[in-house]
Amino acid sequence: PGTNEIFGIHHMDFSLLKECRIFHLGYPPLLPRLIADDGHELEMLLSSVKGEGVITSLDLSLPDSEGNAGLANWPRILKRVLPSVDIFLPSIEEIVFMFRKSEYENWNGNILPNVTGNYLRKLASEILELGVAVTGFKLGVMGFYLQTTKDPQRLQVLESVIDIERWCDVNLWHPAFSVQVQGTTGAGDSAYGGFLTELLHGSSPHEALRIACAVGACNVEQSDAVSGILHRSETQARVEAGWATSSLKLPE
């Protein structure tokens, strides 16, 4: 078996956390040991990291509907682990598959034409109620949606990097930037990375969301996963120069 197959909490060197500001974990659906027993090890891992005072961030991948990950009880897993997650920004396809499986199936996996601003707000509110501080959904050609907790106390864990007052009770959508798409591999990861980078630089929610969209857009201009990504200052300059956004609008 590969490393994904066997990776578990015992592989973690928790002494490294003293050097971390954000602990980011990707792809529980590809880490079968972590999601076994309704996410027992995943919960242990994230709660242990959070117990060290480190900001926790979680990203997903779309499970294989016919594999073990696709058959997992994702509502139960997420309800178990999300209280230990500070930042949670999955794609809309991933979260609908896991949290609203019947809708995913009714829509045949074609999620974007069926979502509205109201749908996203309700779904994000459900996630925030599970204990997450900052959540949102990567929307591909429709951009990025962001929503944060109304509880300033929940944001205290982020106070070393953000202005809590500016980040409390936020509800934002940013359209995608206009690009010639060459490939989408790594687009969501790039956008998430751009968001976390802006968070570490103390940016506002709007700026973090804007740059997240920009980094994702730069990524898709190349066919591979990384070569389109620019330095932060170059990305900012491109946005400030008036980079046009998509004409697609999010229905209310």
Question: Model segments located where?
Answer:
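Ribokinase/PfkB-type carbohydrate-kinase core domain
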Residues: 1-177, 226, 230-252
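Short, small-residue alpha-helix embedded
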Residues: 96-97, 182-205, 209
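Hydrophobic residues in alpha-helical segments
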Residues: 99, 199-200, 219-220, 239
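Glycine-centered loop/turn positions within well-structured domains
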Residues: 142, 193, 218
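Short arginine-rich
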Residues: 218-227
